[in-house]
Amino acid sequence: MTARIGVVTFPGSLDDRDTQRAIRVAGAEPVALWHKDKDLKQVDAVVLCGGFSYGDYLRAGAIARFSPVMDTVIDQAKAGLPVLGICNGFQILTEAHLLPGGMLGNDHLHFICRDQKLRVENADTSWTSDYTAGQEIHIPLKNMDGRYVADRRTLDELEAEGRVAFRYLDMNPNGSLNDIAGITNAAGNVVGLMPHPEHAVESLIGTGRTDGLPFFTSILKKLVNA
């Protein structure tokens, strides 16, 4: 039976179709979920994609966190449902307190769009198991509010528990503390990151790299072997 991965679309989402395409390339079935849906249609995992949900009013992800679909996502994530938040999706996960910390505007106050070098720090999550710890990858990055922040106690816990999933290499593009590009929850089923793996899954388009594909093959293998 084909694994079914839901992709949530909020008003202002930009990368839902790209994410659905990445899921197909990996061999799973994408399932479109609307922000007003309360039923997740029996999906096996959920992706919150990038964009500017609700125009980023109040704060990036702050309004989307209260969409009807998020009530169900939060409940099921706490029960073990794999959830991936990409860019705006990462912001939403922090607003929903499924991941600690928060996101602020880039320290240089400019929108950035670049291919970003990352190091995989944790390859033991639902979404990263097809990588190896220490692996260096290149993933497209595009954001205005990508600066990850947290208090010192939270940062120390993330580092001590191995919950930093990805770290920026060569340069810190937005001022994120500890060069953090992505993190995971303690259980490893919820992962959020600012770069866009869905834009790096096919060699014929974009950068020509497929460094983002393991996100989607990782979750597929986990679901198939569950």
Curated annotation (Swiss-Prot):
Places the protein is found? Cytoplasm
The record's section on SMART domains has: GATase_5 (SM01211)
Question: Is Secreted one of the keywords?
Answer: no
Out of the domains of life, which is the source? Bacteria
GO biological process terms, alphabetically, are: 'de novo' IMP biosynthetic process
List, alphabetically, the CDD domains matched.
Answer: GATase1_FGAR_AT
- What's a GO cellular component annotated to this UniProt protein? cytoplasm
Pathway(s) this gene product operates in, as recorded in its UniProt entry: Purine metabolism; IMP biosynthesis via de novo pathway; 5-amino-1-(5-phospho-D-ribosyl)imidazole from N(2)-formyl-N(1)-(5-phospho-D-ribosyl)glycinamide: step 1/2
GO molecular function terms attached to this record: ATP binding; glutaminase activity; phosphoribosylformylglycinamidine synthase activity
| Pfam families in the record | GATase_5
Look up keyword Cytoplasm and say if it applies.
yes
EC number of the protein: 6.3.5.3, 3.5.1.2
Arranged from A to Z, the UniProt key words for this protein are: ATP-binding, Cytoplasm, Glutamine amidotransferase, Hydrolase, Ligase, Nucleotide-binding, Purine biosynthesis
| Subunit architecture | Part of the FGAM synthase complex composed of 1 PurL, 1 PurQ and 2 PurS subunits.
| NCBIfam families tied to this protein | FGAM_synth_I, PRK03619.1
Q: Which HAMAP family match?
A: PurQ (MF_00421)
What this chain does, per the entry, is described as: Part of the phosphoribosylformylglycinamidine synthase complex involved in the purines biosynthetic pathway. Catalyzes the ATP-dependent conversion of formylglycinamide ribonucleotide (FGAR) and glutamine to yield formylglycinamidine ribonucleotide (FGAM) and glutamate. The FGAM synthase complex is composed of three subunits. PurQ produces an ammonia molecule by converting glutamine to glutamate. PurL transfers the ammonia molecule to FGAR to form FGAM in an ATP-dependent manner.
The name this protein carries in UniProt is: Phosphoribosylformylglycinamidine synthase subunit PurQ
Q: Which organism is it from?
A: Streptomyces coelicolor (strain ATCC BAA-471 / A3(2) / M145)
